[in-house]
Amino acid sequence: MGSSKSKPKDPSQRRHSLEPPDSTHHGGFPASQTPDETAAPDAHRNPSRSFGTVATEPKLFWGFNTSDTVTSPQRAGALAGGVTTFVALYDYESWTETDLSFKKGERLQIVNNTEGDWWLAHSLTTGQTGYIPSNYVAPSDSIQAEEWYFGKITRRESERLLLNPENPRGTFLVRKSETAKGAYCLSVSDFDNAKGPNVKHYKIYKLYSGGFYITSRTQFGSLQQLVAYYSKHADGLCHRLANVCPTSKPQTQGLAKDAWEIPRESLRLEAKLGQGCFGEVWMGTWNDTTRVAIKTLKPGTMSPEAFLQEAQVMKKLRHEKLVQLYAVVSEEPIYIVIEYMSKGSLLDFLKGEMGKYLRLPQLVDMAAQIASGMAYVERMNYVHRDLRAANILVGENLVCKVADFGLARLIEDNEYTARQGAKFPIKWTAPEAALYGRFTIKSDVWSFGILLTELTTKGRVPYPGMVNREVLDQVERGYRMPCPPECPESLHDLMCQCWRKDPEERPTFKYLQAQLLPACVLEVAE
């Protein structure tokens, strides 16, 4: 796919120094206690001074989230328990006449939340009514409305956000624990001369009585009180909580309510970003308001009817590591409108100026993001069919998202469908798919192994010096690419697992995601 960028209006970032109120209850760690010792205080015994009973058994665990996370960061906005008053988490400027503009902090009365991702709301500030993106609001006076609460994001995603070079030491967020139901985790950026920038994670335990604590000697009636206390006192943490982790506005789910099949006239193509065998990719604007990427397909590339049917499935695939499909123009020439990311394709990024500065930990993290997106595709019983660096898009802070999932199946070009010639990506395709057309999630796993070589070689074409026919013959005879220069043997071993001859013996994307361990994080708790 081509490159993509953010909207013309820069997303506002949320960075605030905390001026917390006095805590109502505190105790304190022993002065001699080190950060590592605070990882899981009293992890194997009941609290000695307790205001209630511990709801979950504290325990250590290092692991990764494999749940169906769909946005990053995710903030719940669903109506529950009759709650109808919500607070705006971000500014929103309307894109259509039926949208409602609002400012961060504005209180909104939800009129109707039964129509999917766009809710009908009434502003208690302006008195106006219109549709709002549901992921831009949270129930009033709830933890979801707190700027430091990031909800169900993964440990790895919290590290990526906190390790932004612009974040000072003590930047923090609170998220749901991945390993203990009902518990939370406090993630804090730190720095030391030996390790450089790193992130420490402190599990927040919950009492049956409703209180919270990191160490049983210091308990609080609410998470807000806990954050307020530790923003004034490090008290055993690596650093006091100095700044809330900044984050950009999330993508809305679609361009607007009912904006799916859109008129061609609503799109303005502004700059060509790339060109392939079957079309072009443009930077553009929808409705004169919204920055988007537009993929234009040459007439005859695929059946408009088949494309529209497939697109209905594709738009339901929503994950933080999948490029979001916004809208389509279904008459030829077909236009595909997607979210617009800032750094273009991963292949161009690796081969460009920025690629020179990427080190192994960053490359492995990018691979883990791709595996996360593909693990979701795997859970949804979908198949990509064309997984390679050219079809991964890169955004700010090295965020990677999978694009073009499912489109390869619809291409009607004779040379492509015959799986031969320059148009077909033989070097990325599993032998059973290239020879017999057996495309499955396991053939995607093979392609992921090839993509790992693209990452570790900064965009080198796989099987250097070999033509397509030779690649097929050699792979059938058992040849596998050797370990790339400066690539760890453990990573090459993972590649070879992806290239096992029997598709059923290849690992799952869930397994691959877990194996791509972070390389720059200090384990403290969770």
From Swiss-Prot:
InterPro entries reported in the protein's UniProt record: Kinase-like_dom_sf (IPR011009), Non-receptor_tyrosine_kinases (IPR050198), Prot_kinase_dom (IPR000719), Protein_kinase_ATP_BS (IPR017441), Ser-Thr/Tyr_kinase_cat_dom (IPR001245), SH2 (IPR000980), SH2_dom_sf (IPR036860), SH3-like_dom_sf (IPR036028)
Keyword ATP-binding attached: yes
Keywords: ATP-binding, Kinase, Lipoprotein, Myristate, Nucleotide-binding, Oncogene, Phosphoprotein, Repeat, SH2 domain, SH3 domain, Transferase, Tyrosine-protein kinase
Domain SH3 per the UniProt entry, residue ranges: 71-139, 81-142
Paired cysteines (S-S): none
Top-rank taxon, per record: Viruses
Changes after translation: The phosphorylated form is termed pp60v-src.
GO MF term list: ATP binding; non-membrane spanning protein tyrosine kinase activity
Active site feature: D386
Catalytic activity: L-tyrosyl-[protein] + ATP = O-phospho-L-tyrosyl-[protein] + ADP + H(+)
Ranges for region Disordered: 1-52
Annotated lipid attachment (N-myristoyl glycine): G2
Residues annotated as binding ATP: L273, G274, Q275, G276, C277, F278, G279, E280, V281, K295
CDD domains: SH3_Src (cd12008)
Residues with PTM Phosphotyrosine: Y416
UniProt EC number: 2.7.10.2
Span of domain Protein kinase: 267-517
Biased composition (Basic and acidic residues): 7-25
Record flagged with keyword Ribonucleoprotein: no
Pfam families attached to this UniProt entry: PK_Tyr_Ser-Thr (PF07714), SH2 (PF00017), SH3_1 (PF00018)
Domain SH2 per the UniProt entry, residue ranges: 148-245
Biological function: This phosphoprotein, required for both the initiation and the maintenance of neoplastic transformation, is a protein kinase that catalyzes the phosphorylation of tyrosine residues in vitro.
Subunit field text: Homodimer.
Family recorded in the similarity comment: Belongs to the protein kinase superfamily. Tyr protein kinase family. SRC subfamily.
Name of the protein in question: Tyrosine-protein kinase transforming protein Src
Species lineage: Viruses, Riboviria, Pararnavirae, Artverviricota, Revtraviricetes
